[in-house]
């Protein structure tokens, strides 16, 4: 695990709160991951506090699924996470806004499948902390 990830986990009290920047709790087999918020990893984005959010692996995968399917919704979620990064804490209002976007995505794409025929919205993607 990168040092910035550890530092952010402490600063944002991820373990104490029991949820990540998208309102997901740690599930069996999940790990803590660093998500690039402003400058993507593919564009050489730094692993720096100002450019990151801490996500568990399952919601991190889900966020990139949303990015590929509905870029506007991805941007809405990212905007809320940037706001929390700037504030320096996980704000319940931002988390509820993220949950609203995720719920809307799940309504719009319910039953959708990938090009390979796999379910787009896995069951574990819908298991979020009730805030």
Q: Model-derived features: where do they sit?
A:
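Short microdomains enriched in Cys/His and/or Lys/Arg
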Residues: 40-55, 77-91
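Short Cys/His-centered divalent metal-binding micro-motifs
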Residues: 52-76
């Amino acid at each position: 695990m990168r040092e910035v990830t550890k530092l952010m986990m402490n600063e944002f009290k991820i373990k104490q709160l029991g949820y990540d920047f998208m309102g997901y709790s740690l599930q069996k087999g999940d790990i803590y991951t660093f998500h690039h918020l402003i400058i993507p990893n593919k564009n050489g984005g730094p692993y720096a506090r100002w450019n990151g959010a801490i996500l568990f692996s399952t919601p991190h995968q889900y966020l990139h699924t949303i990015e590929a399917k509905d870029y506007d919704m991805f941007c809405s979620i990212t905007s809320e996470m940037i706001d929390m990064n700037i504030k320096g804490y996980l704000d319940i209002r931002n988390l509820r806004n993220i949950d609203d976007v995720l719920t809307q995505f799940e309504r719009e794409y319910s039953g959708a499948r990938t090009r390979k025929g796999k379910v787009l919205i896995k069951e574990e993607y819908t298991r979020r902390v009730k805030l």
